[in-house]
Amino acid sequence: MNIHEYQGKGILKQFGVAVPKGIVAFSAEEAKQAAEQLFEEQSSPVVVVKAQIHAGGRGKAGGVKLAKSPEEVFEIAQKMLGATLVTHQTGPEGKEVRRLLIEEGMNIDKEFYLGITLDRTTSSNVLMVSTEGGMEIEKVAEETPEKLLKIHVDPVYGLQGFQARKAAFFLGLQGEQFRNGVKFIEALYNAYTTIDASLAEINPLVITKEGRVLALDAKINFDDNALYRHSDFHDLRDITEEDPLEYEASKSNLNYVRLDGNVGCMVNGAGLAMGTMDLIQLSGGRPANFLDVGGGASSKTVEEGFKIILGDKNVKAILVNIFGGIVRCDRVAGGIIEAAKNIGLKVPVIVRLEGTNATEAQKMLDESGLNLISAKGLRDAAEKVQKALATA
């Protein structure tokens, strides 16, 4: 689960992570009032107006502006709220700006990168620091890897003092800045583990000319599998930032990711789902989604899956590819037939079922009298997808 920058900073602040003073605003008038308050409390001649969307690259897209007065903040907020911000992470459709973060201005001396995430290869957390603050860390790792330090942290023992100091040394911090940097890194790691985050990213981490170490931007992602331990975090979810179909799928516990293709797919198992997407591509189509219904696919699960797939108007055909190991193919076939009757399928559905009771399942589909096309293997399924698209 993703959250907004201001929400992430609010959580980090509770763990002693230093963040700038900031106030969230949902209207231009609220933004002006927030600016008035900040100008009274700060010595900086400017405040920062930051669009709050679930995407990076806001600065380059015009989503971060400096203002020298509350009146200027009001004007910026009027233009920014309700506007669509297009960044390299939003796609061409962009995201609508519905809230702003008004933040105190900083007298910045240096900018760095600091991030913590899970490294599945080593089964450990990895602390990453770079002298290239404000840059995309993937680009830094590819083009200037010598400017990036990775420190693997054993999740059992946690972050050790020498590791935090090593990271601060790498950034070239000295004296009071060094001590503040170590304290910041330790506080961030504590927050990351306590809240069960999958990512805690500070980009940039800034050193002010007064020696303060602050998170100028913060990105926090939660591990969805651990959200049951943090019931208070559910209120932080902003469904307006999510794809409507992906949100509906999450309510039915379906693993669904929307893509930009024309062939919907319903599969049990992530590996088979990825293979099916390749099959669709090789057949001349483009996958419209990733949908894993899991090992215990039921009639209700299948019906919900069809509803979500058909919610995408670009879908011209559907490929159902099920391997019946735990789940029985005849049960899945029954679910497909029932769903087809209830929903009223108007696009061709190609169904490939292999495994337990596959023969019975094929017979059920053939005798259903519905627009269900059974396939007897991957090659046959590919050919029938191709044919369905040609007549769509």
UniProtKB/Swiss-Prot annotation:
- Cofactor(s) annotated in UniProt: Mg(2+)
Pfam families given in the database record? ATP-grasp_2, Ligase_CoA
Q: Which Enzyme Commission number(s) are listed?
A: 6.2.1.5
GO molecular function terms attached to this record: ATP binding; magnesium ion binding; succinate-CoA ligase (ADP-forming) activity; succinate-CoA ligase (GDP-forming) activity
Is Cell inner membrane there in the keyword field? no
**Has keyword Magnesium?**
yes
What pathway or pathways are given for this protein in its record? Carbohydrate metabolism; tricarboxylic acid cycle; succinate from succinyl-CoA (ligase route): step 1/1
The record's annotation in InterPro entries points to: ATP-grasp (IPR011761), ATP-grasp_succ-CoA_synth-type (IPR013650), ATP_grasp_subdomain_1 (IPR013815), Succ-CoA_synthase_bsu_CS (IPR017866), SUCC_ACL_C (IPR005811), Succ_CoA_ligase-like_bsu (IPR005809), Succinyl-CoA_synth-like (IPR016102)
Quote the cofactor binding remark.
Answer: Binds 1 Mg(2+) ion per subunit.
Q: Under which main EC class is this enzyme filed?
A: ligase
User: How is this protein annotated for GO cellular component?
Assistant: cytosol; succinate-CoA ligase complex
Q: Which GO terms describe its biological process?
A: succinyl-CoA metabolic process; tricarboxylic acid cycle
- The ATP-grasp domain covers 9-248
* Keyword line: ATP-binding, Ligase, Magnesium, Metal-binding, Nucleotide-binding, Tricarboxylic acid cycle
Q: How does it assemble?
A: Heterotetramer of two alpha and two beta subunits.
The entry sums up its family as follows:
Belongs to the succinate/malate CoA ligase beta subunit family.
HAMAP family from the UniProt entry: Succ_CoA_beta (MF_00558)
Protein known as: Succinate--CoA ligase [ADP-forming] subunit beta
Q: What is the lineage of its organism?
A: Bacteria, Pseudomonadati, Chlorobiota, Chlorobiia, Chlorobiales
Q: From the UniProt record, report the name of the gene that encodes this protein.
A: sucC
